[in-house]
Amino acid sequence: MALRLNTVQPTFAPAPPKDSKTSATQAMSTNEDKLKTLIGHAKEYGFVFQSSEIYDGLSATYDYGPYGVELKNNIRRYWWEAMTKLNENLVGLDAAIFMHPSTWKASGHVDAFNDPLIDNKDSKKRYRADVLLEEHIAKYADKIEKEVEKGKKKFGDGFDEVQFRATNPNVKRAQERIDAVEGRMKAALDANDLEALRQLIIDEEIKCPISGTANWTEVRQFNLMFATELGSVSGESSTIYLRPETAQGIFVNFLNVQKSARMKIPFGIAQTGKAFRNEIVARQFVFRMREFEQMEMQFFIKPGSQQEWYEHWKAKRMAWHRALGLPADNYRFHDHIKLAHYADAACDIEFRFPMGFKELEGIHSRTDFDLGNHEKLSGKKLRYFDTETNESYVPYVVETSIGLDRMFLALLSAAFQQETLENGEVRDVLRLPAPLAPVKVAVLPLIKKDGLPEKARAIIDTLKLDHNCQYDEKDSIGKRYRRQDAIGTPYCITVDHETLTDNAVTIRERDSMAQERVKIEALPQVVNEKVDLRGLLRKL
């Protein structure tokens, strides 16, 4: 069957005109509709549920259902094996969530882990001031890209993009605005000048996307750490924190890992686990939650080599994403305007979510900030002795940090499509990369009798030790195909009456819906070639 794509696609609507409340509302509504469609699909098919739903839910907390947890596990495994299997100088760690409170004093989180927040008085909505400005800057960047695209179409093969960007008056004006806003924003953030940040928002006439007004409150700082009490007796307890990042567990264990695993610099430590942030502005489904999962790697290097390794890991991490086969224009690098308190270089890999380009992964050059501060506050040496140069030093660190929940949303939003077939039927399909799909193979007996169910279950028995398989005999074969399409199952195996005589089955591929006949004894090899994770790892 020929396919015709419907309009429900995970793309970002054009930015509305600055002075158009109606256009802004319509654009936001379009993006919200796309996200709502995705959220509805995720709930209906067992990927994500609102946490505590029977009690009307808890804001910005979600539970992963049967297929969601499988997809999460597969993403985690892909990351873990890409880190620890493909790099001999990378090992793993699983540190505790609770840590000595001095950890967070040394790391700077007690004093500097804040978000600048601003409220719109009319809509009563709260926003991060820096994000409002970054989204405003992005609109100018979009204007530049549109001008460049127009130039490419006009001049064809003779188009000189570098010269065009340098000479086109519209591009130059937009770039001047970007430079001006970024300059003022960086100065305000570096100086922690909240009034200057608010004034910049007012000067740029940035409006609330809900109310369409620029009626803003003052900007205030909010610390993002969750505090709790350790101890059961009142007056004898002490304040500890739910970790806001997994990285500090790696830093305090640096020497333990280095000595026990006999590692030499450069080497890395990888960890996945839960982190917690008291996000005041928590929204957009699983994109920004108060409880989330990180996949972080800290790479320890000799001081002075950080720029080389920073570029190395930028390239490596983008290659990891691109190996999944998603369109290249879904990704871009974004350099930080304001560096975190621990960094001398930082950038994000941004992804085109339904709500636009947003941070997916961060790559940071953390210098010796963390190890140096832990050494000072703890009084314990956290130094590496280099036998080749006969010197001792506190290593520098390059970090890669990706939110597992955001990666989940990125894959789900890019994979979800609603297709209209030639016969007018609409099918929901998740075009997930086959090695990451929650269910790899569905085995479907054509009918529930004549020995077909028994044959189907025998096939599952040969495959289930290697792959997550699903048996389904309810409803017509067409409806069963649609169910598997909706959860992203890459291959369906149909057992029919001919199977009993020719010992062959029909394999249907999810994306093309093409079918082929395969002998049962060849199934393990055929399926492995199509869905094995090693196929992704070989691309790296």
Question: Could you describe each region identified by the protein language model?
Answer:
Residues 7, 11-24:
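Short, positively charged and aromatic/hydrophobic N-terminal segments
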